[in-house]
Curated annotation (Swiss-Prot):
KW Cytoplasm (keyword) present: no
Annotated protein name in UniProt: Small ribosomal subunit protein uS8
UniProt GO cellular component terms: ribonucleoprotein complex; ribosome
Alphabetized UniProt keyword annotations: Ribonucleoprotein, Ribosomal protein, RNA-binding, rRNA-binding
Complexes and interactors: Part of the 30S ribosomal subunit. Contacts proteins S5 and S12.
Organism from which the protein derives: Blochmanniella pennsylvanica (strain BPEN)
A GO term, aspect molecular function: structural constituent of ribosome
Entry-linked PROSITE patterns: RIBOSOMAL_S8
Family statement drawn from the similarity comment of this UniProt entry: Belongs to the universal ribosomal protein uS8 family.
Gene name linked to the record: rpsH
Function comment: One of the primary rRNA binding proteins, it binds directly to 16S rRNA central domain where it helps coordinate assembly of the platform of the 30S subunit.
UniProt xrefs under Pfam families: Ribosomal_S8 (PF00410)
One Gene Ontology biological process: translation
Length: 131
């Protein structure tokens, strides 16, 4: 695991957990990761999440599947990364799969989806997209 980009590590853990059909995955917790997972819960891509407080806080993500254990998340990909930050204005925000997916954006209003950013008329750093 690379500790350079902990958000990419979390997204990879979620992707690998869904491929191997796990019920839940665990990752070290941070405020940004909790905000991203909260957006995924609101949009229905994962069931729920818990923060286990111990010596090192751990984020438990409970994955969601359709019938016959087909993962709800088809694609989850990191866009902006530490070596190349990607910022977009509201009018430049792309759509994922013609609106079938979401883009998670870090804005001055918090971590929100692309649709919410358009409503609030804000742009920001494109963290990842999910479909």
């Amino acid at each position: 695991m690379s500790m350079q980009d902990s958000i990419a590590d979390m997204l990879t853990t979620i992707r690998n957990g869904q491929i191997s059909k796990k019920e839940k995955v665990c990752t070290p917790s941070s405020a940004m990761k909790v905000a991203i997972v909260h957006v995924l819960v609101e949009e229905g891509f994962i069931q729920k999440y818990n923060i286990k407080d111990s010596i090192k806080p751990t984020l438990e993500v409970f994955l969601k599947y359709y019938q016959k254990r087909k993962p709800v998340i088809d694609i989850i990909k990191r866009i902006s990364r530490p070596g190349l930050r990607i910022y977009k204005k509201r009018k430049e925000l792309p759509q994922v799969m013609s609106g079938m997916g979401i883009i998670i954006i870090s804005t001055s209003k918090g971590v929100i989806t692309d649709n919410r950013a358009r409503q609030l008329n804000v742009g920001g750093e494109i963290i990842c997209y999910v479909s």
